[in-house]
Regions:
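Short, well-structured alpha-helical segments in soluble
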Residues: 72-88, 197-206
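Bacterial Sec-dependent N-terminal signal peptides
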Residues: 1-25, 355
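Extracytoplasmic ligand/sensor domains, especially the bilobed periplasmic-binding protein
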Residues: 91-176, 250-252
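N-terminal extracellular/periplasmic Venus flytrap/periplasmic-binding protein-like
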Residues: 20-81
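Hinge/beta->alpha junction and helix N-cap segments in small-molecule ligand-binding domains
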Residues: 66-72, 117-119, 133-140, 161-172, ...
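Extracellular/periplasmic periplasmic-binding protein-like sensory domains
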Residues: 225-303
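Segments of small-molecule ligand-sensing domains
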Residues: 292-353
Length: 355
């Protein structure tokens, strides 16, 4: 089936929802301050409320029912609550064990079910009313490898072994190596602990170099950047581009100059622009309304909630941090395909390029 545009899906989604005079929204998430899950989902819920507040100012009639659905709870006791079956759309759950029951419930009452965060299972393949925002890591890896093959044609790949026993990037680098080998593209592997002269031999002086680490952690990144600085000092004309990981966005505040110097590209399904005027305004508004700052997490949960409200309830494809781009699953629901490369430009500045 041909991919539908994000705006078209959002528009049709909201036309169906707003066919009634009042849109009834349900939220079924752990909404408490007992643990990290509860605090994060409470912040997400608050972001939803801020978005709904803006939509009401635009003339939308929206009511919200929120139910606490903790990890040790029973979804059945929530689903029988007054108002649950009257919802037009429900945001939740957080925990995979509740999905089957909620999906069946929403199917029976013709309710749209937005699953905003990580779950396991293939429910979106079987339920036409599910909108799955979460992207499996395997899909992210495959999409990233495909994008590397397209965007960095002609580059000389250098994979750096960081000796990180805690790394979870082995499956990605293996997939990347297989893609290079299938296409007959030569790549070199070196080790961050190699002597400088040995490390240098892995690089090309005639072609642009694309450096990929087999670790996403900050200490290993720092070691490699130090190694590259030495390499560039001896070879000032050598061209180096680094392709990193989503986790690097957490380190960008302290590495912006290095990211720009090495033309860093990061795959992501969000971009938090701390200096953006609208982002700052929403963060300030959050503090005024709830008397505390958003948690220091990427992506910001409150802004994610706000973006979800504007997309699902207001058919807006403009986003502050968390873009959505859904594709219809044949015989099932909708899966989020939003994918960006965050590019730190050597000339300064950052751009988020959609693919």
């Amino acid at each position: 089936m041909k991919r539908l545009t994000s705006f078209f899906i959002a528009f049709i989604f909201c036309c169906n929802l707003f066919a009634q005079d009042t849109l009834k929204v349900g939220v079924m998430l752990p909404l408490h301050k007992i643990d990290g899950d509860g605090k994060r989902m409470l912040e997400y819920y608050r972001g939803l409320l801020l978005g709904i507040e803006d939509l009401k100012k635009q003339g939308k009639n929206i009511t919200v029912h929120a139910w606490n659905m903790p990890a040790n709870g029973d979804a059945r006791t929530v689903l029988v609550r007054e108002g649950a079956s009257n919802c037009n759309i429900i945001f939740g759950p957080l925990y995979s064990k509740y999905v089957n029951l909620m999906a069946d419930f929403c199917k029976a009452y013709n309710i749209k079910l937005v699953i905003p965060f990580s779950i396991t299972g293939d429910h979106v393949d079987h339920y036409s009313n599910i909108y799955q925002v979460y992207q499996p890591q395997s899909w992210i890896d495959e999409t990233t490898v495909q994008r590397i093959m397209i965007n960095f044609t002609g580059y000389h790949p250098v994979i750096v072994n960081c000796n990180d026993t805690l790394s979870k990037k082995g499956s990605f680098t293996n997939m990347l190596r297989q893609a290079y080998e299938t296409r007959g593209i030569q790549y070199n592997i070196t080790n961050v602990q190699n002597p400088d002269d040995t490390f240098e031999k892995a690089f090309s002086t005639k072609r642009k170099n694309l450096v990929i680490l087999n670790s996403g952690r900050s200490p290993e990144l720092t070691k490699v950047i130090t190694k590259l600085d030495t390499l560039k000092a001896h070879n000032p004309e050598m061209e180096i581009t680094m392709f990193g990981y989503n986790e690097w966005l957490m380190y960008a505040k302290y590495n912006k100059a290095n990211f720009e110097k090495y033309n860093v590209h990061l795959p992501s399904n969000y971009y938090h622009n701390e200096n953006g005027k609208q982002v700052q305004a929403l963060q300030d508004r959050y503090f005024r309304n709830f008397h505390e700052n958003m948690q220091y997490a990427l992506p910001r949960f409150a802004i994610t909630g706000y973006d979800h409200a504007m997309y699902f309830l207001g058919h807006s494809t403009r986003w502050l941090q968390t873009p959505l781009d859904f594709e219809k699953v044949p015989g099932g629901g909708y899966r989020n395909k939003a994918f960006y490369l965050i590019h730190y430009k050597p000339t300064g500045g950052v751009e988020a390029v959609k693919y």
